[in-house]
A protein has these predicted regions:
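Short C-terminal beta-strand
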Residues: 382-384
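C-terminal lobe/tail of nucleotide-utilizing enzymes
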Residues: 166, 192-333, 344-346, 350-362, ...
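Short, surface-exposed loop/turn motifs with a glycine/proline- and acidic-biased composition
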Residues: 362-379
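Generic beta-strand structural signal
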Residues: 315-317, 340-341, 371-376
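Nucleotide-state-sensitive switch-loop elements of NTP-binding domains
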Residues: 1-12, 16-192
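Short, solvent-exposed amphipathic alpha-helical segments in soluble enzyme
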Residues: 50-51, 146, 223-228, 341-342
């Protein structure tokens, strides 16, 4: 079973490549599904057919779906939202403002990931391809499982007795009933399951789609850094709209410029396959055209092949304590940051942040120092820990 998420800068052809990969896998005898989590939902246009919330077979072995996030949101969050509205109403807040405040940030997007999880766990498919939104939205989407779990933990404590102790001090605040707690606990569990699936070694990976242009390649490098920071593995790069050699002077200039960028891709993503799609005379619309496009892209390669697992994060024992190592390809000393917050390590690259919950041994240590080893695609953050004498003997 494989899950492959496709993302890249807007307009590079993510939807076409995701659908073509699915069509190619189906042509090779796999049961394959392509799911759109992009609010623009151009997948139906690429396939030339109407799609709904449930997977439908569009050709032999190939299935497709477009997630109705609004309906999924109402099923999963309505009970909690009703309770929050009652709390805010008891506090005298205007109903319109209260309704705005009870919208869980990013809920609709992450519920699209729950649909992906359900399809992957169903046992019906050998491959699930996910047509994601452009890069910035996809990165936000992939951060959401961890972010929302943090948000929910603070919205309603995990233990009912804690919530009851707090809320009963204020008589005007309604006490949440079992339905509310069950909804929150269910969503917390589902978020953890989504995160586990999408970071599962050998099962899930991200495939970057780009065009051989300097600005697009630069964004792809930043995307690799962000995905590595949050624990997601990239399994390859698809370069779309590559000009074939030959032609007039105008095309030869384009070929020269693109070849320079393709070499930059090889240097920026060493060890990863680089598949290329030639600039076609028209859009591949329909399953037949997409399957042909996919065959041209992947050739004899398996579009759903196994991904060698390269651990992004590791902890090793040292002479003086421990060393935590995190792959951060293309990060620099200028944009990498590090801080400690209780049991969490806050790692940043530029404006991006991730809270890494430390394992038990490291929670009883102090951070002695950190450095960024290597450069370019080989950059890694190494954090040194030493046992805290006041805590280390406790167990």
């Amino acid at each position: 079973m494989r899950v492959v998420l496709f993302t890249g800068k807007g307009g590079v052809g993510k939807t076409t490549v995701a659908a073509a990969t699915t069509a190619r896998a189906a042509a090779l005898g796999r049961k394959a599904l392509v799911v759109s989590t992009d609010p623009a939902h151009s997948l139906a246009d690429a396939l030339g057919t109407e799609l709904g919330d449930e997977p439908v077979e569009v050709d032999g072995g190939m299935h497709a779906a477009q997630v109705d996030t609004q309906r999924a949101f109402e099923r999963s969050w309505r009970a909690v939202q009703r309770y929050l509205l009652a709390v805010l109403d008891a506090g005298g807040l205007d109903p319109v403002d209260a309704a705005e405040l009870t919208v869980l940030p990013g809920a609709e997007e992450v519920l699209a990931l729950l649909a992906v999880r359900d399809a992957a766990r169903s046992g019906r498919f050998d491959l699930v391809c996910v047509d994601c939104a452009p890069t910035a939205e996809t990165l936000r989407l992939l951060r959401l499982p961890e972010l929302l779990r943090w948000w929910l933990d603070r919205l309603l404590p995990a233990e009912r007795r804690v919530a009851r102790a707090l809320l009963t001090r204020v008589r005007s605040v309604p006490m949440p009933d079992a339905t509310v707690f069950e909804a929150v606990q269910r969503l917390q569990g589902e978020l953890a399951d989504v995160r586990a699936l999408l970071t599962e070694p050998g099962t899930s990976s991200v495939r970057l789609v780009l065009t051989p242009e300097a600005v697009v390649v630069a964004e792809a490098r930043r995307t690799l850094t962000a995905l590595s920071l949050h624990g997601y593995q990239v399994d390859g790069v698809v370069a779309n709209r590559v000009f074939p050699a030959g032609g007039d002077a105008w095309r030869r200039r384009w070929v020269t410029a693109q070849q320079a960028q393709l070499e930059a891709v090889r240097q920026s993503f060493p060890g990863l396959p680089l598949w290329q799609a030639a600039y076609a005379g028209g859009e591949p619309v329909g399953v037949g055209a997409l399957a042909e496009f996919g065959a041209d892209v992947y050739g004899s390669a398996d579009p759903a092949g196994e991904v060698p697992h390269v651990p992004a994060l590791s902890v090793q024992r040292t002479v003086d304590g421990f060393a935590l190592s995190l792959a951060l390809p293309h990060a620099t000393h200028r944009d990498a940051t590090l801080s400690r917050s209780g049991d969490d390590l806050v790692v940043g690259v530029g404006a991006d942040r991730r809270l890494l919950t430390l394992p038990s041994a490291l929670r009883r240590c102090v951070v002695e120092g950190a450095r960024l080893d290597g450069a370019g695609p080989d950059a890694r953050l190494v954090v040194r820990f030493a046992p805290d004498p006041d805590l280390w003997m406790r167990s």
